Amino acid sequence: MTSTINRPLDGEGSVQVKQDPKINIEEGALVIAVYGKGGIGKSTTSSNLSAAFSKLGKKVLQIGCDPKHDSTFTLTHKMVPTVIDILEEVDFHSEELRPTDFMFEGFNGVMCVESGGPPAGTGCGGYVTGQTVKLLKEHHLLEDTDVVIFDVLGDVVCGGFAAPLQHANYCLIVTANDFDSIFAMNRIVSAIKAKAKNYKVRLGGVVANRSKDTDQIDKFNERTGLKTMAHFKDVDAIRRSRLKKCTIFEMEPTEDVIEVQNEYLSLAKNMLEKVEPLEGNPLKDREIFDLLGFD
């Protein structure tokens, strides 16, 4: 059994492994980690937000942190090889790789990387994320980047998949207006609060997704000190854009599509200019049940 007695704490009550400071992302880039309940639309949100930043003239890098490696396919219009798979091919001798082996250009110049992950039941997702950032630094691929977006697996907030929080300035939480999504969001708020003790990451806000209304999200925000930064209703064009393997900015400019595009552009502008770090105060599980009307 592995001992945890001598491990440095990484947030109260945590035995997460501290990130090597040598693989931090350079100061100057805006680094955003996108979290949320599994299947809530994080990859769609991340890719469209990356596209929006690029429309504002920013150099953008999106890093998919999911073994499914499907974060960036609406940007690249294909499934790209993962960093971990490519490293395995060269027996982890990263010096043998070229940037074109693992980094791919997508819509409007957005650069795309899929970190991938270890086989099911083995390894650690945090290690893979760390190796990805290390590889990007070794090839000097972060030096001229304005915005980095980490699109992170599900609502997992263990030491592994919480690793992107150690690089991020802000975390955006994608949620729907339902109990399960908000319950997952509360757990993520707890993880961010723990990470903020030792790292620069702060809560940037909430993205309401696939929801006509936001009344339950608003209740939660009011109790916990969060703020909704963008609201994307259940617009069919967003679903169809994913089926077409493209971003919302490549869809026919109908009234609904233009409205969604403008909301993404507004979110990107606010993250660049107006975002205020939030001091989130997570609720206990029972408090969420009571808040959202369960007996």
Swiss-Prot record:
Keywords: 4Fe-4S, ATP-binding, Chlorophyll biosynthesis, Iron, Iron-sulfur, Magnesium, Metal-binding, Nucleotide-binding, Oxidoreductase, Photosynthesis. Mg(2+) binds at S43. Pfam families: Fer4_NifH. [4Fe-4S] cluster binds at C124, C158. Pathway: Porphyrin-containing compound metabolism; chlorophyll biosynthesis (light-independent). The keyword Nucleus does not apply. It comes from the Bacteria. Binds 1 [4Fe-4S] cluster per dimer. It catalyses: chlorophyllide a + oxidized 2[4Fe-4S]-[ferredoxin] + 2 ADP + 2 phosphate = protochlorophyllide a + reduced 2[4Fe-4S]-[ferredoxin] + 2 ATP + 2 H2O. GO terms for biological process: light-independent chlorophyll biosynthetic process; photosynthesis, dark reaction. PROSITE patterns: NIFH_FRXC_1, NIFH_FRXC_2, NIFH_FRXC_3. ATP binds at G39, I40, G41, K42, S43, T44, K68, N209, R210. Its cofactor is [4Fe-4S] cluster. GO terms for molecular function: 4 iron, 4 sulfur cluster binding; ATP binding; metal ion binding; oxidoreductase activity, acting on iron-sulfur proteins as donors; oxidoreductase activity, acting on the CH-CH group of donors, iron-sulfur protein as acceptor. NCBIfam families: DPOR_bchL. Component of the dark-operative protochlorophyllide reductase (DPOR) that uses Mg-ATP and reduced ferredoxin to reduce ring D of protochlorophyllide (Pchlide) to form chlorophyllide a (Chlide). This reaction is light-independent. The L component serves as a unique electron donor to the NB-component of the complex, and binds Mg-ATP. This is Light-independent protochlorophyllide reductase iron-sulfur ATP-binding protein. The gene is chlL.
